[in-house]
């Protein structure tokens, strides 16, 4: 048994904390909402994020971040991209030893183009930081909570951290593969949300399988181009954290990004869609970052750039599709 802390009480953090608790580890979750913390401790449920799921009886939660940080040397970071720096600053203030961080967030910081692992590293003092990894792949929290077979990848520059993640998470329904391409796994997990938004739009417009298949394929090409430019192994995008995550996020009604895009395709404004979602839609923020990166690095990303114009510049969805289909003739 190991002591593990999970920072974040959203759907994915809760599902992973439940797996760790099922695996007989001593798990303490941290959340800023006291009512959610009380619900986890008293009823062993988190109805807002994992409806109708009974959590393991030994799973505990706290709203005191110092208590959570001091509880364990292994810390799972499961908060939205926009909260990473502020949360890590709080962790850094109270940490008393070197910590191992495994994050499950999927995003890129706008303007700086930093990946999550880079943000975590920057916010921690060296004497409090042992290393960082990422857990990513085709995985809906709802299905993992139901113990449906799920397979993901863990990536880190540190072989020991990859092994730690594999050891603490793996069981009969949750399989973990290791990967040494930290850049590729993080980029794949972040950028697929852009394509999932676009896939939701095509479904909302009533287009069929042809359009979605083309969108996913050309979207993967965009992800690979930008990821390779940033130093990723292109083969990573053919694995679980690339095409695997892309498929599940573009085709499932569980996907927040697909749901948001679907509402946009049916005529909702971005503000209306986000308000109705009531949860973080990482693809919106990532579209902004990726559009800036494409321009900065000189990478051709027409789907991403069209989605950016739709989200932030008022481009009509039908006009956006028309523009993509009428682009200059080119080789695949």
UniProtKB/Swiss-Prot annotation:
GO biological process terms on file: carbohydrate metabolic process; glycerol-3-phosphate biosynthetic process; glycerol-3-phosphate catabolic process; glycerophospholipid metabolic process; phospholipid biosynthetic process
Entries under Gene3D superfamilies matching the protein: N-(1-d-carboxylethyl)-l-norvaline Dehydrogenase, domain 2 (1.10.1040.10), NAD(P)-binding Rossmann-like Domain (3.40.50.720)
UniProt keyword terms in alphabetical order: Cytoplasm, Lipid biosynthesis, Lipid metabolism, NAD, NADP, Nucleotide-binding, Oxidoreductase, Phospholipid biosynthesis, Phospholipid metabolism
Any one Gene Ontology cellular component term annotated for this protein: cytosol
Compartment(s) of residence: Cytoplasm
Residues binding sn-glycerol 3-phosphate, per UniProt: 106, 137, 139, 192, 245, 255-257
Reactions performed catalytically: sn-glycerol 3-phosphate + NAD(+) = dihydroxyacetone phosphate + NADH + H(+); sn-glycerol 3-phosphate + NADP(+) = dihydroxyacetone phosphate + NADPH + H(+)
InterPro entries named in the record: 6-PGluconate_DH-like_C_sf, 6PGD_dom2, G3P_DH_NAD-dep, G3P_DH_NAD-dep_C, G3P_DH_NAD-dep_N, NAD(P)-bd_dom_sf
Main location: cytoplasm
Keyword S-adenosyl-L-methionine carried by entry: no
Pathway: Membrane lipid metabolism; glycerophospholipid metabolism
UniProt GO molecular function: glycerol-3-phosphate dehydrogenase [NAD(P)+] activity; NAD binding
EC number assigned by the record: 1.1.1.94
Keyword Lipid biosynthesis: yes
Protein task: Catalyzes the reduction of the glycolytic intermediate dihydroxyacetone phosphate (DHAP) to sn-glycerol 3-phosphate (G3P), the key precursor for phospholipid synthesis.
Protein family: Belongs to the NAD-dependent glycerol-3-phosphate dehydrogenase family.
Name listed for the protein in its UniProt record: Glycerol-3-phosphate dehydrogenase [NAD(P)+]
Species for this entry: Macrococcus caseolyticus (strain JCSC5402) (Macrococcoides caseolyticum)
Gene: gpsA
């Amino acid at each position: 048994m190991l002591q593990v802390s999970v920072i974040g009480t959203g759907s994915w953090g809760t599902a992973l904390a439940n797996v760790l608790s099922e695996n007989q580890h001593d798990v303490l979750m941290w959340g800023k909402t006291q009512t959610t913390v009380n619900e986890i401790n008293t009823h062993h449920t988190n109805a807002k994020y994992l409806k109708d799921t009974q959590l393991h009886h030994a799973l505990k939660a706290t709203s005191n971040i110092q208590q959570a940080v001091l509880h364990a040397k292994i810390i799972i970071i499961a908060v939205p991209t926009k909260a990473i720096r502020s949360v890590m600053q709080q962790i850094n203030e109270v940490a008393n030893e070197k910590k191992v961080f495994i994050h499950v967030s999927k995003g890129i910081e706008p303007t700086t183009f930093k990946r999550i692992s880079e943000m975590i590293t920057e916010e921690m003092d060296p004497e409090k930081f042992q290393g960082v990894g990422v857990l990513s792949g085709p995985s809906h929290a709802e299905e993992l909570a139901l113990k449906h077979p799920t397979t993901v990848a863990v990536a880190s520059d540190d072989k020991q951290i990859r092994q730690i993640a594999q050891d603490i998470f793996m069981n009969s329904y949750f399989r973990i593969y290791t990967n040494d391409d930290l850049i590729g796994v993080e980029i794949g997990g972040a950028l697929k949300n852009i394509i999932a938004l676009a896939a939701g739009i095509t479904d909302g417009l009533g287009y069929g399988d042809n359009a979605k298949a083309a969108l996913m394929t050309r979207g993967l090409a965009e992800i690979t181009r930008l990821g390779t430019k940033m130093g990723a192994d292109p083969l990573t995008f053919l694995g679980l954290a690339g095409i695997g995550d892309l498929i599940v996020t573009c085709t499932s009604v569980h996907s927040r990004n697909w749901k948001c895009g679907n509402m946009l395709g049916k005529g909702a404004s971005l503000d209306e869609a986000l308000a109705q979602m009531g949860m973080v839609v990482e693809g919106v923020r990532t579209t902004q970052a990726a559009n800036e990166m494409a321009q900065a690095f000189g990478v051709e990303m027409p789907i991403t750039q069209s989605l950016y114009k739709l989200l932030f510049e008022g481009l009509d969805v039908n006009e956006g599709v028309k523009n993509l289909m009428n682009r200059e003739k080119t080789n695949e």
